Structures are given as C-alpha cells and as structure tokens.
Amino acid sequence: MGFTVVYLSLIVLIPLAALFLRAAGIGWSDFWDMIKDPRVLASFKLTFSTSFYAALTNAVFGFIVAWVLSRYTFPGRRFIDAVVDLPFALPTAASGITLSILYGKQGWIGALLPFRVTYTQLGIFVALTFIGLPFVVRAVQPAIDDIERELEEVAASLGASRWKTFWKVLFPGLLPALLTGFTMAFARAIGEYGSVIFIRGNKAVFGDEMVPYGGIIAPEIIFDKLVVSTPESLNQATAIAVTMLIVSFVLLFVINMLQLWGTRKYRETR
C-alpha cells in the first residue's frame, strides 16, 4: 500500500501539484487574459471538438471491428487483430509521417480523393482517429467475448429478432465498455501532438482560405511557449495546460458517471 502511494505520488500527484502551484502564482487576472487570447480559444475549440468527433467515430467503427473480431472466424483474422494494435506501437511522429504520405496530394489515398486532407482540420481528425481506434477495440472486445450465448438463445426462443436481441439484450451490457473505450480515445486525442503536426503541417487551409489560428491545437501552443522559455511564455503554457486539465477532468468525470449509471441500470434490468 505504501509503495503504491509513493509511486502514484511521484508519477502523477506531485507533477500535477507542481503545475497547479505554478498556476496559482500567476494571478487570476493574468491567468484569464492568457486564456481568453483568440489564438488560445481557437486552439481549445479545435482540440476538444476534433477529439470528440474522432472519439465518437472510433466508438462506432471500433465497436464494429471488435464485434467482427470477436464473433467471426475468417482468413486473416489474427493479422487484422494484430494490426489494430499498430497505433500503440508506432511512435506518434512515425504515425504522422505515414498518414501524411498516404493522404498527401500524391499519396495512395490522397490522390484518389476530390478534396484535401493534409494541412486541414480533416487531417487532424484523421490523425486523432488513427491513434484512438485501439482504445475502443481493446475495451469492447473482451466484453463481447464475455457475453453469455444463453442470453441470445433465450431471447430467440421468446420470439425476439436478432436486431431486437442486440439492442435490448446485448448492447446494454456492452455500453459501459464502449463508454470506457470512448473515454480513453477522447483523453488520448486531447493530448496528441506528434502525429498531428506532421499531417497538419505549418499552415491551416480550409477550402481556399487561410484561417489564422484555426489549425493550431492546444498542445502545440504549449510546446511553442515552452520553446520560447521566457517567464511570460512559461506562465501562459501553464495556464493553457491547467485549463485543458480541468476541462478534460470534468468531461471525463461526466462520461464516467454516465458509464456508472449505465452499469447500474443494466444490472437492475437483469
């Protein structure tokens, strides 16, 4: 128990405490001025909205992938199961370079598309979806494996269709695992930096229009401020990091409460 507390303190609690202590020394007025900067606000909007949509996309397609891998046997199944974990193993920079090559104007995929992916918000979305998919698949797949086949047999014997059996019997039990995967994918996307800067590049292009601040994610602003390394830039990096941390914690807390509610609701109906 003592070792656990010490380890947790060194890895998580002490760094977070140091961050909040530095933020407390900035002063509320200066803190607020740093946060309401248009460039920072735009980066928050881009970071959280794109992370949410990427996690939501992964929740849908990650669930389908997990279901297929769990319920069906087919040639190449083990290979696909291993490929799912590839974003875990790849360095984020390697992921960004790979996606940039694939989705660039001359890339295998980008050359076939009638619209641009690299240097756009869509490119950021692609990168965040890529790195978040394994979190959903690996959270949902064990839950699907643990489903009792008797539940489906009983539902079928009572005249329920396969679709109704899925939505009324199976899905409620899988929802907590799906929310867990969504939460992890969302949290991972919020802090992603390496893969995004390669596919987004040094400019943000939306249609034919150059949009100032529109393509910069919050982690990139934090990094830029740390590189400058002046007292003012370090304070702004701290303010942005603390704000992201608080907002992320609130969002994850709400999602976890929904997950807990779903689990209790499912147990009550069984």
Task: List the predicted regions and their residue ranges.
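Interhelical loop and adjacent transmembrane-helix boundary motif
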Residues: P38, I190, V196-T263
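Membrane-interfacial helix termini and adjacent extracytoplasmic/periplasmic loops
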Residues: W28-K36, L41, G76-R77, G96-F130, ...
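Transmembrane alpha-helices
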Residues: G2-Y7, L56, L86, L90, ...
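N-terminal signal-anchor/first transmembrane alpha helix
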Residues: M1-A18
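Hydrophobic alpha-helical transmembrane segments of multipass integral membrane proteins
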Residues: L10, K45, S49-F61, V65, ...
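Transmembrane-helix boundary motif in ABC transporter permease subunits
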Residues: F31, Y53-V84, I97, I101, ...
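Periplasmic/extracellular loop-to-transmembrane helix junction in inner-membrane transport proteins
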Residues: L19-L56, V68-Y72, D224-L234
